[in-house]
Amino acid sequence: MKRSISPDPFSSTKSPKLVHHSPDDGGAEGNPYRLPFTLSDENLSCLPISQAREPPPIFNLDPNSVKDTQDRNKLYLAKAWDLLKPAIKIILDDDEYKKPGDVLCFTTIFRAVKRACLGDPRQSELVFNLVKHECEPHIAELIQSLEKNCSGSDDPSVFLPHVYNRWLDFKRKMSLVSDVAMYQTLNGLTLWDVGQKLFHKQLSMAPQLQDQVITGILRLITDERLGKAANNTSDLLKNLMDMFRMQWQCTYVYKDPFLDSTSKFYAEEAEQVLQRSDISHYLKYVERTFLAEEEKCDKHYFFFSSSRSRLMKVLKSQLLEAHSSFLEEGFMLLMDESLIDDLRRMYRLFSMVDSEDYIDRILRAYILAKGEGARQEGSLQELHTSIDKIWHQCFGQDDLLDKTIRDCFEGFGLHVPGEFSDQLQWIDDDDDED
């Protein structure tokens, strides 16, 4: 399958041109070359290499000339690296090859790496180490450049687009390195993964830059939550958050600041909403918030998806638990007026955070508060009928709540027929007939 990759439109670097040659094209004197993007046509997909010679006969070596397997593997690896190393340099430096001369086909590099690594994980590890050693100075230089360009700027709209462009350019280059190295994997990691780890290593050695980027990301997230974000913020955020994808073990790097920022934001916003809302409007606000945050998780906003369970706990804490007295009073009002949509919404919200037991507790309190008066007035059955209707329509026929309703009313002396009790009665009747 041919794969076409366009140069990054945001990159500030000048991309070399892609030139195809026929087999008769010889030296193609005066033409610039760049790394090809297809593996299927070795006559068209060529990469310039300084002082390249005719492709060495690395696939037709006489077995008798190399008797020792270890020496043969070393020879394969050395020849593969002779081809791969200059290719990596061209990719990372975005070099344009302007000197006339021979070209070395991409597929030749591809096959050489395959021959060197075939069936021997130790050889793959050596290739990985060589590539890491070749790439790390370039990545260190990239981080130093970002430090220099971003220092002294606290405005995310100024420095984050620059970081974004350089990150996209880095992703493009490391993807090409992985391509030309035959998509080698080691312990489940690709060369792209290795490149990203090196990026994080160098970024962690520049803590001021790292904190600056994370702070900028959090400010963009806040703007997006407030509806102030520009149209392109979503793509910008997703790519910037992906910079930290391989740092999943270092929760203090991005998770803790993200969750702290989220907690502070919703604590303040919930207070503002409560000042101008009744129970119905507040429940709608909480539902919109839950759905918006879950949507970001589903759309692979990395900070959100990697912190999903903790994020939902923060929302539960700041939007529900922190205002439990308000919600309990509101629940009583909703039950009194049988506001089905709001009761259904309230149950759904607490179910989303696995807190059905909270609904169970306030439902029990409601029945006990209303039941004594209903018994004295002789309207206990009417109260049960009303609550049972709400249970069917709003509470998903939750078994826990059903048991609570049954226990409370039976405590007031009202017999509550049900499927389970009716089945026992039917069994008892059969036993009496026998």
Swiss-Prot record:
Q: Name one GO molecular function term.
A: ubiquitin protein ligase binding
Q: Where is this region: Disordered?
A: 1-34
User: What superkingdom heads the lineage?
Assistant: Eukaryota
What GO terms in the biological process aspect are recorded for it?
ubiquitin-dependent protein catabolic process
Tell me the protein family, please.
Belongs to the cullin family.
What protein is this chain from?
Cullin-like protein 5
Q: What is the lineage of its organism?
A: Eukaryota, Viridiplantae, Streptophyta, Embryophyta, Tracheophyta
